[in-house]
């Protein structure tokens, strides 16, 4: 098994409800280690750039509006198979479909306000990490 890094974001719906500590604890309890973390409030342009892959999707405008509506906590996580492990701990995008005990089952309000975002591949992780962090900010 390989130690790898992935990107994680705690979204505005969760930061508004002061859940950053509880969510980070769930990630750490799963064996993931936070090697970089900062609180950011993205503007519309940053949200549009970060979620550019969804630009043609019908929910894009709503997503950009939501993601720029409040602070987020962006993190780099490290661990054995970190990408898959993070996705497992997050749970299904739709909290109604998420397994018991996952972040989205426990904390999400809806499919759009689903508390967290995580990279879905090594390539995406690299892109998302470098969007928010310089190498000097990642301390393993």
From Swiss-Prot:
Catalytic residues (UniProt): 117 (pros-phosphohistidine intermediate)
Subcellular location: Cytoplasm
Reaction(s) the record says it catalyses: a 2'-deoxyribonucleoside 5'-diphosphate + ATP = a 2'-deoxyribonucleoside 5'-triphosphate + ADP; a ribonucleoside 5'-diphosphate + ATP = a ribonucleoside 5'-triphosphate + ADP
EC assignment: 2.7.4.6
GO biological process, one term: UTP biosynthetic process
Cofactor field: Mg(2+)
Gene Ontology molecular functions: ATP binding; metal ion binding; nucleoside diphosphate kinase activity
Keywords: ATP-binding, Cytoplasm, Kinase, Magnesium, Metal-binding, Nucleotide metabolism, Nucleotide-binding, Phosphoprotein, Transferase
GO CC term, one of those recorded: cytoplasm
Binding residue positions for ATP: 11, 59, 87, 93, 104, 114
Stored Pfam families: NDK
UniProt cross-references to HAMAP family, sorted A to Z: NDP_kinase
Family membership noted in the UniProt record: Belongs to the NDK family.
PANTHER family, per database record: NUCLEOSIDE DIPHOSPHATE KINASE, NUCLEOSIDE DIPHOSPHATE KINASE DDB_G0292928-RELATED
Function: Major role in the synthesis of nucleoside triphosphates other than ATP. The ATP gamma phosphate is transferred to the NDP beta phosphate via a ping-pong mechanism, using a phosphorylated active-site intermediate.
Quaternary structure and interacting proteins, as annotated: Homotetramer.
NCBIfam families documented for this protein: PRK00668.1 (NF001908)
Protein's recorded name: Nucleoside diphosphate kinase
Organism: Bartonella quintana (strain Toulouse)
Gene (UniProt): ndk
């Amino acid at each position: 098994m390989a130690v790898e890094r992935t990107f994680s974001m705690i979204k505005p719906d969760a930061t508004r409800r002061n859940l950053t500590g509880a969510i980070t604890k769930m990630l750490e309890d799963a064996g993931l280690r936070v090697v970089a973390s900062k609180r950011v409030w993205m503007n519309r342009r940053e949200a549009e750039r970060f979620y550019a892959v969804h630009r043609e999707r019908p929910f894009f405008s709503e997503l950009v509006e939501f993601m720029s509506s409040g602070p987020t906590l962006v993190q780099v996580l490290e661990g054995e198979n970190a990408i898959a492990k993070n996705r497992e701990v997050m749970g299904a995008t739709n909290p109604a479909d998420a397994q018991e005990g996952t972040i989205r089952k426990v904390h999400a309000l809806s499919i759009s306000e689903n508390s967290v975002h995580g990279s879905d591949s090594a390539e995406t992780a690299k892109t998302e990490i470098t969007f928010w962090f310089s190498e000097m900010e990642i301390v393993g």
